[in-house]
Amino acid sequence: VSTFNVTGYSLGGFNAAYVAKLDETRQSFNFENVLLINPPVSIYNSISLLDRMINNIPGGMDNFDTFFNNLMRAYTNVYKESADAIGDDFLYKAYKALNLKDEQLAALIGVSFRLSSASLIFTSDVVVDFGFIKPKGLILNRYSNLTQYNEVANRIGFTDYYHEFFYPFYKETEPDATRNEFIAAISLKEIEDYLRSTEKITVMHNADDIILQPGEIEFFADVFGTRATIYPTGGHCGNMSYRDNVAHMVEVFTGGGTP
């Protein structure tokens, strides 16, 4: 192996930027090219957007179980009537068959994020024994009933986790850091000077990405300049497999940078 490149999408794109900066100091890989695909500007801002999408559930969070069960029942019916294996074609067919309104789609995205974040939050709580969901000091084993913890976790927003678990936990080792300083530290703006100055990092994004707050897409055009390729549509990573987009990604790594 003579050269190393790195890429990542979504949170992985965010991480790739920080890994590249860290490698400037450690010189472990000396990355030749780095491609960020649909990264957030601010992790906190993006998770706040995803958190709020769950508010689109008809009847609110009190109707979470009913909404989720009805959705899975409809999804199962489409699956039974389809000869397609679960994949892009099937998911598109399910989307068309369910005929979801924009609010329902937003709620679905919110539920998907909530289920993923619930697992992360509960696992983190168990590993460090913080006492956020599981009582502090309680030891779980393979036979422990986790139903009650799952019900609690599904009703905890990621921003709640940040303010009530993440920040207090790290506050013990960084006592002088404020909440806003912690939020600022998990943002690409924290390494903006580096991103402006290095020629090895390029970004591929979509103007309508749902994880970006209004105005955040301009950050990429401003900071990366000609190293930014911003498509008008595509949502969050929705056009990664398009032929032109794939060709762009390949060109970044084989053509020495921005096509």
Residue positions per predicted region:
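Alpha/beta-hydrolase active-site loop
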Residues: V1
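Short beta-strand immediately N-terminal to the catalytic nucleophile in serine-hydrolase-like folds
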Residues: V6-G8, I37
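Catalytic histidine-centered segment of alpha/beta-hydrolase-like enzymes
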Residues: Y231-N245
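Active-site nucleophile elbow and catalytic-triad environment of alpha/beta-hydrolase enzymes
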Residues: E172-D193
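Alpha/beta-hydrolase-fold enzymes
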Residues: K21-N145
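Short beta-strand/loop motif that positions the catalytic acidic residue
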Residues: S197, T202-H205
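Conserved alpha/beta-hydrolase "acid-adjacent" motif
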Residues: I210-E216
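Gly/Ala-rich beta-loop-alpha elbow adjacent to hydrolase catalytic centers
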Residues: G8-A16
